[in-house]
Amino acid sequence: MSSCGCGSGCSCGSGCNCKNPVLGLSEKTTSKTIVADVAPVKSHPEGSEMSVEGGHGCKCGSSCNCDPCNC
């Protein structure tokens, strides 16, 4: 559990290894590049920036640590 920490936006980082209990997939954050003047910019978050990890029990606790680490 020593590598369990929060990633960008105070969401669980890769060390937490949260998995979807139904699909068994690891959840990872993604980044995207926005090219201006080509397409409209989305003004709402798509979920990866949220502080709670997809409702699977992984959330940030005190001192921005994942709580609980074992999802």
Swiss-Prot record:
InterPro entries: Metalthion_15p. Belongs to the metallothionein superfamily. Type 15 family. Keywords: Metal-binding, Metal-thiolate cluster. This is Metallothionein-like protein 1. Metallothioneins have a high content of cysteine residues that bind various heavy metals. It comes from Casuarina glauca (Swamp oak). It comes from the Eukaryota. PANTHER family: METALLOTHIONEIN-LIKE PROTEIN 2A, METALLOTHIONEIN-LIKE PROTEIN 4B. One of its GO terms (molecular function) is metal ion binding.
